A protein has these predicted regions:
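Helix-breaking motifs and short loop linkers at transmembrane-helix boundaries and internal kinks
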Residues: 49, 81, 102-108, 247, ...
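Conserved MFS/SLC helix-loop-helix module at the cytosolic interface between two early adjacent transmembrane helices
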Residues: 68-104
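Helix-to-loop junctions at the C-terminal end of transmembrane segments
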Residues: 69-81, 267-279, 363
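Paired small-residue
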Residues: 96, 107-115, 305-313
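Helix-loop-helix hairpin linking two adjacent transmembrane segments in secondary transporters
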Residues: 108, 137-138, 145-191
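Cytoplasmic helix-loop-helix junction between adjacent transmembrane helices
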Residues: 112-150
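C-terminal transmembrane helical hairpin of 12-TM major facilitator-type secondary transporters
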Residues: 281-324
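A late C-terminal transmembrane helix in Major Facilitator Superfamily
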Residues: 332-368, 375
């Protein structure tokens, strides 16, 4: 079996597309596992004898462990074969499903959720670095878009599938159904991924935070964090907006949410072409367009057809954007993509938490219009910083 060292250029190697698609299946199971409790919260809480609020903390603990893992995994893993590390994360994912499915108490359930958090943080932090080593440089954005396609597909089907399985075979059966898919992802990665050596000199003693010394990295990560803050300041509260402002029915709500998911999946299929044609222009345009959508929703929130159309456009743009930011990591830090990926995971998770919290505070105190306005303002700031980032990259290329 072939072995790729840390700096292997895929211009001299053939592409491992089987490995890309195997990892995409793993992404699908990861995201489905992460958000499965959302649609199963009521029966899960009743069975474990806890409140729905406590059961919901299973999502919080997975997010917290994802942040910690993403920040320190590269340093802890040292020169470990990255194929073995990815396979280990996949085993943790399968083990998490088993532990949750057979959990007899709340503590065991939370242990299973902690394991899925470690798998999420580890897997995503290595995604850009792995894509760089599996495909030629000009195909990295496409590979990352395929990863994100697995994310988008899981986002579309996880909640309704979890709800259906929970109603037919119970919440334990729903989690158990993820285990054979995780095993299939493990086997596919085992046969399709090459051996990938880690850094022989290990990670810097300063860890991933040393990257903040580079202005382009600092500005880029702040711009990325503002984008996700602006996105989730609005999107977290789209359901109460649709129910109380647009006054959609239960079936209408499901259809609009499904349309958002489908549009997002389509966006991941198209974004590679746009990024390859105009990379930074695309990263600037996405938050600008989303800010415009936020403003348009304030003006037309009572018109169900316009809201449905704008929501679909929002889903297409918001779901496509992560592909661009992961590609930015691959372009900016090709020799340090693991550390950059770790920072990116932490930044995104924290930005989502901050955005949803700030949006909720404004929603409760000032109303939905102020929440949507806040989202638009933050997204405009993200676009401005991304423009600054493009100038920094341009000036650096002339030096």
């Amino acid at each position: 079996m072939s072995t790729l060292n840390h700096t292997t250029s895929q211009h001299e190697e053939h592409a491992y597309w089987g490995g890309i698609f195997a990892m995409t299946l793993c992404v699908f199971v990861l995201i489905a596992s992460e958000f499965m409790p959302v649609s199963l919260l009521t029966p899960l809480a009743a069975d474990l004898g806890v409140t729905e609020g406590l059961a919901g903390q299973g999502i919080a603990i997975s997010g917290a462990l994802a942040v910690l893992t993403s920040l320190f995994l590269s340093r802890l893993a040292g020169n470990m074969n990255r194929k073995h590390l990815l396979l280990g994360m996949t085993i943790l994912m399968a083990l998490s499903g088993l532990i949750i499915a057979f959990a007899q108490n709340y503590q065991t359930y939370m242990t299973g959720r902690a394991l899925i958090g470690i798998a999420i943080g580890g897997f995503w932090s290595m995604s850009a670095a792995t894509a760089i080593r599996l495909v030629p440089h000009h195909q990295v954005t496409r590979a990352l878009a395929i990863f994100n396609g697995g994310n988008a597909l899981a986002t579309v089907v996880a909640a309704p599938l979890g709800s259906y399985l929970g109603a037919t075979i119970g919440w334990r059966g729903a989690f158990l159904c993820l285990v054979p898919v995780a095993i299939a992802a493990f086997l596919w990665q085992y046969v399709s991924l090459p051996n990938m050596s880690g850094r022989k000199n290990g990670a810097s003693g300063e860890g991933v935070f040393r990257l903040f010394r580079q202005p382009v990295v600092s500005v880029g990560l702040i711009a990325c964090s503002l984008f996700f803050m602006g996105q989730f300041a609005l999107f977290t509260y789209v359901r109460p907006f649709l129910e109380t402002v647009t006054h959609v029915s239960a079936s209408g709500l499901s259809l609009i949410l499904l349309a958002i998911g489908i549009a997002g999946f389509v966006g991941t299929l198209l974004v590679t072409l746009v990024l390859n044609a105009a990379f930074y222009l695309t990263l600037i345009a996405i938050p600008l367009l989303m800010a415009a959508i936020a403003g348009a929703l304030i003006l037309t929130g009572h018109n169900v057809w316009i809201v449905a159309l704008l929501s679909g456009l929002w889903g297409m743009l918001a779901t496509a954007a992560p592909t661009g930011w992961w590609a930015w990591v691959a372009r900016t830090l090709p020799e340090d993509a693991e550390a950059g990926g770790g920072l990116m995971v932490a930044v995104i998770q924290l930005a989502i938490a901050l955005g949803s919290t700030a949006g909720g505070m404004v929603f409760n105190r000032l109303g939905w219009q102020s929440t949507f306005a806040l989202s638009g303002i933050v997204l405009l700031c993200a676009a401005a910083l991304t423009f600054m980032l493009s100038r920094l990259r341009e000036s650096a290329s002339w030096k």
